[in-house]
Amino acid sequence: MNNLPQKCRSVVGLHFCRKFSCGNVLYQDTAKKTVLYDFHKKHDGKMVDFAGWMMPVQYKALGIKASHHHTRKQASLFDVSHMLQTKIYGKDKESFIESLVVGDIKGLNANSGTLSLLTNENGGILDDLIINKTNEGYLYVVSNAGCSDKIKAHFKDQVQSFKSQGGDVLIEHNDNGLLALQGPAMVDVLQNGMKQKLSELPFMTNVEDIIFGIPNCRVSRCGYTGEDGVEISIPIEKTVEMAEALLENPKVELAGLGARDSLRLEAGLCLYGNDIDESTTPVEASLTWCIGKRRRAEANFPGAEIILKQIKDKPDRRRVGLTISSSIARHGAEVEDEKGTKIGIVTSGCPSPTLSANIAMAYVARKHNKVGKTVLVNIRNKKIPATVTKMPFVPSNYYFVK
């Protein structure tokens, strides 16, 4: 990893580069571009290859730390158009998706959503995704860019199998733009541009609306920062217009992958390919809450036998937060006990701009993963003390209707 470009190491962190190439490793000849690529260049975005897409890691106007703070205090605009957006139709659409994920999708209210997990027969996580039930007769699903090809193929295979058994379902992937407006000023910025009262749209609900004169937009109150925010799905030909309209507000600044990563880590949110993958189960990943009560009783999701046994007996390891006394623990750093025995591994780590401390996520053995426990992290051959810490590291500010 030391052979990676310096901007990968210092700006985004090594964990971004483990699976997704940055800067000079893979460049524009092979990477795809979102509809906002020229917009990013116009606004002096520093572009890197992430998950096969040319994306801004930061902008000239604000460094990553300043962008991070701006998101916590005002509002930042992120391009997340590289993510896979899918619509699922048919009278059996909920039964179909429940045959693949651990969540209670049938139990969702109209225009509400949930984080869920696609699992395999071994209980491993194929992807994490947001599933929204809409009033327009379809499920709206957002999943990770890095898993796009895998998930498309998986959906295709599963649709064929489901239909062969008489099920009625249709999958449609769309190329809409996707913008995330995140931060406490989001409501002030967005409310004047839409009919829906945001005071009546709590966390993890969604609505189709006309936004700043642009029809057929879907607004979902969610995000990847721990702040109040929305993700807006926009017809591709209107995405630049929407971005420019939002950026006209002086409370809004553009933000890139660098700030997005430190924000999500402070919020205790996983990055697929680093913190979760096909070798980790929902229970090991501390995502047991994603498994619906009814789904546990029915035990009919992929890997249910293994996952439910782990819920009952406790897994041998679990994803936890670490606060580190000094130095930055990057992906792959080993966690040890006081005797020098390996007891875990770091999956993500960065300096926390909010806390002015070094934080990380790690999988740690059961005996050592209790909050308050002191462990050692091997950083450049030095044993650095760290404390197992409850996540999120920074309190979340999601909006709920009282």
Language-model segments: what does each one mean?
Residues 5-8, 13-119, 124:
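Acidic, proline/glycine-enriched N-terminal capping motif
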